[in-house]
Design a protein with these regions (language model features):
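Protein-protein interaction/assembly regions in multi-subunit complexes
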Residues: 2-191, 195, 200-240, 251-271, ...
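Extended C-terminal regions of large enzymes
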Residues: 152-156, 161-192, 198-538
Length: 538
């Protein structure tokens, strides 16, 4: 049991096999040592056993808040999803924003632990400190968007006001190894195959109704001082400043042009470090231009709204709307997730600079519940394998930048409907092993790299290699210093000092993931503000 501020001391352990729900507190020593969020969630997963089958009923799926979740602390709407990954075979934790983390805290919970496997599809309904399993047979097979609509219609609540849902799509239901969990239509626990684990448990969704259990600081004065200082630094930052900073104006995709200019944008399955270097080396048509899919271009042409997560003044989410023709059919697509990582993987790395096609594919990936980074990178891997004749025996191949085929393949990957879709759904490690395609796989521990070329950013290369959840930019975000100059500018191409830099960011992000607050706080505030808010709350 713990009486630390910021905690409800209330965790639900849900046995999906039997349908039983037990409630337990949090050990005081664990709360102090592991903090919450990622720290506590990974401990639950580790204690559950390291030899479990990731897709077996014995694997644990943990949704965990941190002590700052749902408070006034800036950008404190995050939630950690922790499990053993079917993609990498090791521990993973994946975080998403939006409002579900805060609402879970307000409903009286610090976390939800799912074990076992339901005989039939179910969803978990969470309200006022209790969890109830309900039939989800009518939701099974639906995409995420239709699932969200059905959930909202079936409950006395409204998204954006007092209701949140975290759901899987066909990707999770069918065991795509990089399937993800989608929160409120477009915020993703994207990496590591959390959606695959959720699908293996026949758990379609977790629905959370807001309550009134708002966290109260143990030391209001200390917390308020830390919070106010943090907000001031966020407002003054060139990166996070509301309506002025690059992240606020253009979202994460502000990095597209910056990475391109410094030759740090993996292009053509990482063969090149920018679209202009690809064009210079191979002047034959078609060449592509990263600027066409940049945050600046998106803002100027297809931006329609800028919603935000709980307690966030930055509003990095960029909602877009496009009218796009696919196979003679015109579609209108509106979505909130035109992120840099997604745009890189489905764009330059796949030799695609069709801005609107990327918006369509991001929205479709979210609906199917598959990670945009791994999906785009698997498409790029398939394109290079096609070029090298490694897929000649299949009835389907994929050419560079073939957006029509890319869009169709998303469905085939999630549903595993074609030979190529079934192959790519296995993830890079298994494809490389089955097809002798290790040279085509840009992955560490079976998870593909993000949108920062390690040849141009040595710190990021160390980060990919040492991340415990596979290739990951978020474990230790060295581009903060290597691109943005925060806390100070370093030469991205030099090795000296990069191990120390990477370790610094890995430690910092372990803390923010456990609080659980957004890493973008670190673009403005520092450890002093973190400590003041944590000490004041607990």
């Amino acid at each position: 049991m713990t009486d630390l501020g910021g905690f409800n001391d209330h965790v639900a352990r849900v046995d999906l096999t039997s349908g039983d729900v037990r409630y337990e507190g949090i050990d005081e020593e664990d709360a102090r040592k592991y903090i919450g969020g990622r720290g506590l969630g990974v401990k639950y997963v580790f204690d559950n056993g390291t030899d479990v089958d990731p897709e077996g009923p014995e694997n644990l799926l943990a949704f965990m808040n941190g002590p700052l979740t749902g408070t006034q602390a800036p950008m404190s709407g995050r939630i950690a999803v922790c499990t053993k990954s079917p993609l990498t075979g090791t521990v993973t934790d994946s975080h998403h924003g939006g409002w579900s983390g805060a609402r879970l805290k307000w409903s009286g919970f610090d976390g939800l632990l799912f074990e076992g496997r339901a005989d039939e599809p179910v969803y978990a309904y969470v309200e006022d400190g209790e969890v109830e399993l309900r039939d989800a047979s009518d939701l099974w097979g639906m995409g995420v968007h239709d699932t969200m609509d059905a959930i909202e219609e079936g409950h006395d609540g409204q998204f954006g006001k007092n209701l949140s849902a975290m759901a899987i799509g066909p990707g999770g239901e069918n065991g795509t190894k990089y399937a993800c969990i989608i929160n409120e239509d477009d915020r993703a626990s994207g990496r590591g195959g959390t959606g695959c684990v959720m699908g293996s448990k026949n758990l379609k969704a977790v629905v959370v109704k807001s309550g009134t259990k708002m966290p109260k600081p143990a030391d209001p004065e200390t917390f308020t001082e830390g919070y106010q200082q943090a907000m001031q630094l966020i407002r003054e930052s060139d990166v996070t400043g509301p309506n002025e900073g690059g992240l606020s104006l253009y979202g994460t995709n502000v990095l597209m042009n910056l990475a391109e200019e410094m030759d740090g944008l993996p292009t053509r399955n990482g063969r090149y470090t920018s679209t202009h270097s690809e064009a210079e080396d191979d002047p034959s048509e078609p060449n592509i231009d990263a600027e066409k899919v940049s945050g600046e271009n998106v803002r100027e042409n297809i931006l329609v709204d800028e919603p935000t997560c709980h307690s966030c003044p930055v509003a990095c989410k960029k909602e877009t709307e496009v009218t796009y023709e696919h196979k003679g059919e015109e579609m209108n697509v509106r979505g909130e997730s035109y992120e840099y990582e997604s745009a890189y993987a489905l764009g330059p790395n796949s030799m695609n600079d069709d801005r609107d096609s990327i918006a369509v594919m991001i929205n479709r990936c979210n609906d199917l519940g598959i990670d945009t980074i791994d999906t785009g990178n698997m498409l790029a891997m398939a394109m290079e394998m096609t070029e090298q004749g490694k897929l000649d025996d299949l009835d389907d191949e994929l050419e560079w930048g073939d957006t029509e085929h890319m869009i169709d393949l998303l469905e085939e990957i999630a549903h595993q409907e074609s030979d190529l879709g079934e192959l790519l759904a296995k993830g890079p490690r298994r494809v490389a092993e089955e097809r002798d395609a290790h040279d085509n796989s840009l992955a560490v521990k079976g998870q593909t790299i993000a949108a920062y070329d390690p040849r141009a950013m040595k710190g990021m290369g160390i980060g990919y290699a040492t991340s415990n959840r596979g290739a990951c930019h978020l474990r230790g975000y060295t581009p903060s210093a290597e691109i943005l100059g925060i806390p100070e500018k370093v030469d991205p191409t030099e090795w000296e000092g990069k191990g120390e830099l990477c370790a610094l960011f890995q430690d910092l992000h372990a803390i923010s993931d456990s609080f659980d607050i957004c890493k973008f706080n670190a673009f403005a505030e520092g450890i002093d503000e973190y400590v003041a808010q944590y000490n004041g709350m607990t």
